[in-house]
């Protein structure tokens, strides 16, 4: 049980996919201008990352490895992710049309979010079992969501702040992301 908790904490804080591994930067910068969109994207990404991580593990263990098809791993994981994203998009469209409109193009772009594929591939490389794969996927999603929501809240405050003209927009966003990354470096010694 302790091993699973350490894996979760490590994935969320110490080895954050956005700030440490630099995966998922496109939605991190693209959806973070409004807090409401960031929360919606976080929920959708959490669902997709967790489910895709579990399904990728199952596809790898019960389809690719037994038939010696490991060379198709990346392509099959992309297919699994695309199916999960389409399912998520249908659910979001049925449950919240406003959220579906707010997320716009970013919801289908979860398919190409490198963090989702990165989690699936790292699960295989780190030889996680089923429970570890689920926890790793969920932890990566929670870490992504945490950073996205915090960054979005900071960007909303920066939009209202008196920022010098050369730093407005993307420049101050990159500086803020760098400072967030430095703050998360404080968690480095937390899990060994």
From Swiss-Prot:
It is found in: Cell inner membrane. It is a multi-pass membrane protein. InterPro entries: Ion_transpt_RnfA/RsxA, NqrDE/RnfAE, NqrDE/RnfAE_oxidrdctase. The chain crosses the membrane at residues 5-25, 39-59, 65-85, 102-122, 134-154, 171-191. It comes from the Bacteria. GO terms for cellular component: plasma membrane. Its EC number is 7.-.-.-. Pfam families: Rnf-Nqr (PF02508). It is an enzyme of class 7 (translocase). Keywords: Cell inner membrane, Cell membrane, Electron transport, Membrane, Translocase, Transmembrane, Transmembrane helix, Transport. One of its GO terms (biological process) is electron transport chain. Belongs to the NqrDE/RnfAE family. Part of a membrane-bound complex that couples electron transfer with translocation of ions across the membrane. HAMAP family: RsxA_RnfA. The complex is composed of six subunits: RnfA, RnfB, RnfC, RnfD, RnfE and RnfG. This is Ion-translocating oxidoreductase complex subunit A. It comes from Shewanella putrefaciens (strain CN-32 / ATCC BAA-453). The lineage of its organism: Bacteria, Pseudomonadati, Pseudomonadota, Gammaproteobacteria, Alteromonadales. The gene is rnfA.
């Amino acid at each position: 049980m302790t091993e699973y908790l350490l894996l979760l904490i490590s994935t969320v804080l110490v080895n954050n996919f956005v700030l440490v591994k630099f995966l998922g930067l496109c939605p991190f910068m693209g959806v973070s201008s409004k807090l409401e969109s960031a929360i919606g994207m976080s929920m959708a990404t959490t669902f997709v990352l967790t489910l895709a991580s579990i399904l990728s593990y199952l596809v790898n263990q019960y389809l690719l490895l037994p038939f010696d098809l490991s060379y198709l791993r990346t392509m099959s994981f992309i297919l699994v992710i695309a199916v999960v994203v389409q399912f998520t998009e249908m659910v979001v469209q049925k449950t919240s049309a406003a959220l579906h409109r707010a997320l716009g193009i970013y919801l289908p772009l979860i398919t190409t979010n490198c963090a989702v594929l990165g989690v699936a591939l790292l699960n295989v490389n780190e030889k996680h079992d089923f429970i570890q794969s689920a926890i790793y996927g969920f932890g990566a999603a929670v870490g992504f969501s945490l950073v996205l929501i915090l960054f979005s809240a900071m960007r909303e405050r920066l939009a209202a702040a008196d920022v010098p003209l050369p730093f407005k927009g993307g420049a101050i966003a990159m500086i803020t992301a760098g400072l967030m990354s430095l703050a998360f470096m404080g968690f480095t010694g937390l899990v060994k």
